[in-house]
Amino acid sequence: MSQILTTRQAEELHKSMVAYLSSLEASKSTAALREELVLPDTFDDATCKKYAGLLEKKFLTCSLKANPSKDNGLSALQILDLESKVAGLQAELSSLTLTSRSKGGQDPDNWLPGPASTRTFESHRDAITCIAFHPIFTSLASSSEDCTIKIWDWELGELERTLKGHIRAVTGLDFGGQKGNTLLASCSSDLTVKLWDPSKGYANIRTLSGHDHSVSAVRFLTSTENLLVSAGRDASIRIWDVSTGYCVKVLRSSDAWIRDISSSFDGKWLVAGGRDQAVTVWEVATAEQKSALLGHENYIECCVIAPPTSYEHLATLAGLKKPPAPSSSCEFIATGARDKTIRLWESRGRLIKTLVGHDNWVRDLVFHPNGKHLISVADDKTIRCWDLSQEGKLVKTIDNAHSHFVTCMRWGPSATTDVETTNGVTNKGTTKSKFQCVIATGSADSCVRVFS
């Protein structure tokens, strides 16, 4: 027995030696060494695989200690250690689900925001115009009429950085882009759309020019990697390829200011609403307008396409015998306007319900991921929760959510995974949602609040 190694260390070394020979497919040598070392019966082929590569790593570690790199001040051993830690963190991040990051003990499906915010962020010098959650990290972006964008850590309650580049009010934000390469898009009254790269310290990597007036809203097309949509006061909807910066399509139906846009979960449909009191429905592939929703009596401030989780409840409201298939997109739409109402529509143009309760302009809407609730904010300083399973009944009101108009709202990041059927085939139309119980609101009081 070696006097340097303990019994356990010697046994680990012997196992790694056998695993090394086994990986070389040297069966005779492996068998001979096994017999010579008298390894226990529990060291079977499956256990042997766990030791694969261990001997090489030990040799490399010793080699690096003897020959440190002097190129960048770090030894090669330190670099190896850092690479190992990075790999471990990446594995941990991959295994972390969105729901596991929510507070334990909550029932996400029935969660609604409470009367008190958990975080209040104050740094902007003018009204908040839009907010957006990073899809993976606990970063929250806010835009303001003070011409800046601020990035917050909404869990720690810290301001991470301030982005400057726009020269007039920043009016819209959205995170999106290729998987693993998330970008932040912003739009402004300075007629531009800007792209910021979080992986490069939120460097402004591209500016998209083409609008002839203030840009009001910007959205990444869901389920596409490179397409971004913007709309504005020049009455146009522009679709951009963010990888090239080129405008690939321009949609236009009237001369009215477009205030908001929304895309379907599969990126095939767009809806837009604005000053002409109409909501238009567009097919992205053909750039054709498919329908117009008419009924509001003042400017439309917000529009959102209903998720498939809401189809069951909205189909009942619409008097349908059965809900549309979950794989279909843009079946129902919710809109909010300066006429103080929220309207629920079939995408073909039929009004199915008008929700009345706000005392001022309705500024933003978001569907609860469970599909059962619709949440709204307005210039009456309230957050209101509507139960679609009870014919759109108002079930909760948070008064004085802010000290001034509540201008915008977003739900925290959600993820959906395809559900496998019993025969193992993936059903693209049936998804399982994982989401966090958190929403953020912005206000004309220059504050951002987080409810979680």
Curated annotation (Swiss-Prot):
Compartments reported by the entry: Cytoplasm, Cytoskeleton; Cytoplasm, Cytoskeleton, Spindle pole
Gene Ontology molecular function terms on file: dynein complex binding
Purpose of the protein: Positively regulates the activity of the minus-end directed microtubule motor protein dynein. May enhance dynein-mediated microtubule sliding by targeting dynein to the microtubule plus end. Required for nuclear migration during vegetative growth as well as development. Required for retrograde early endosome (EE) transport from the hyphal tip. Required for localization of dynein to the mitotic spindle poles. Recruits additional proteins to the dynein complex at SPBs.
UniProt keyword terms in alphabetical order: Cell cycle, Cell division, Coiled coil, Cytoplasm, Cytoskeleton, Microtubule, Mitosis, Repeat, Transport, WD repeat
Record's keyword annotation contains Transcription: no
Similarity comment: Belongs to the WD repeat LIS1/nudF family.
UniProt cross-references to PANTHER family, sorted A to Z: F-BOX AND WD REPEAT DOMAIN CONTAINING 7 (PTHR19848:SF8), WD40 REPEAT PROTEIN (PTHR19848)
Pfam families, per database record: LisH_PAC1 (PF24951), WD40 (PF00400)
Identification of the protein by name: Nuclear distribution protein nudF 2
